[in-house]
């Protein structure tokens, strides 16, 4: 119980880097190739893990050009539009993949256990909070600023 009393509460923006995926002008459908680095889209955010069917891919050149959108083990990827409370954890098998413009990437800093943070986002109370801060009636959406408000 003493640990709970001494527990600090932080905003997500203070304990993680939050990045929006590449905008349409940076990555076009014409850039997709048959063999290359997979790109996670909203459609690939499965039940806590990525679904791997019909993944778009980009060339090594585009991966280098868009290197700030490369995922690392421990990242958490969110839907930026629609089901904004849906997220998937980047495990070792998906390290080096990329994420699309309709996603947000959360990269916890070194002091934060990424799996702990991921499980926090899987809690129904946290999911409800994310749904509540979303903007838009027809198509809910979140951005880096809104997601950064999660505490």
Go through each PLM region and give its residues:
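Active-site PLP-lysine loop of aminotransferase-like
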Residues: 108
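Cleft-lining beta-strand/loop regions that shape enzyme active-site pockets
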Residues: 40
